[in-house]
Amino acid sequence: DCLPGWSSHEGHCYKVFNLAKTWEDAEKFCTEQANSGHLVSIDSKKEANFVAELVSQNIKETRRTDFVWIGLRVEDKRQHCSSEWSDGSSINYQNWIEAESKKCLGLEKQTRYRKWVNLNCGQPYRFTCEI
C-alpha cells in the first residue's frame, strides 16, 4: 500500500514532485519522505515505461521540465558512474542517450522521459521519488 498521492508499481511507490531541486537536495528530500525513500532507481524497461508515463502525466509544464532527476550520479574523481543507485541497489538496466559522463543523471522530455541524459548536479530540476 502506498501513501496517499503516491503510485504503486510492482511493490514500490512513486511520486513526481514539481519542486525544482539540485540532485543532492532532491535525494535528501526523497529520503525525508519515508524511511526507504530515494530518487527513483530504474531496474527494467517495464519500470522505465511506468516512470516515464508517471512523469508525463504529473509534471507541471514550465521551462524547468525538460529534465527530471533519477537516482544515479558520478561518484569518483575519474568521473566513472556509480555502480549503484542512490538507494544502494545494483544497476542492471541502462538507457543512456549517449555514453558519456557528466555528473548526475536525469530523464529527458524530448525522449518522453524514457532516455537518460547527463546533467549538471547543481541545476535545479523536478524529480521522482521511490519508496
UniProtKB/Swiss-Prot annotation:
Which tissues carry this protein? Expressed by the venom gland.
Summarizing the function annotation, the protein's role is:
Interferes with one step of hemostasis (modulation of platelet aggregation, or coagulation cascade, for example).
**Which PROSITE patterns does the protein's record reference?**
C_TYPE_LECTIN_1 (PS00615), C_TYPE_LECTIN_2 (PS50041)
What name does the UniProt record give this protein? Snaclec A8
Give the InterPro entries listed for this entry.
C-type_lectin-like, C-type_lectin-like/link_sf, C-type_lectin/snaclec_domain, C-type_lectin_CS, CTDL_fold
- Limits of the C-type lectin domain: 9-130
According to its UniProt entry, this protein's organism is Macrovipera lebetinus
Family as reported in the entry's similarity comment: Belongs to the snaclec family.
Reply yes or no: does the keyword Nucleotide-binding apply: no
Q: Which GO terms describe its cellular component?
A: extracellular region
Signal peptide residue numbers: none
**Alphabetical keyword list:** Disulfide bond, Hemostasis impairing toxin, Secreted, Toxin
Q: Where is this protein found? A: Secreted
Q: Write down the SMART domains for this protein, in alphabetical order.
A: CLECT (SM00034)
Q: What is the lineage of its organism?
A: Eukaryota, Metazoa, Chordata, Craniata, Vertebrata
Quaternary structure note: Heterodimer; disulfide-linked.
- What is a single molecular function from GO for this protein? toxin activity
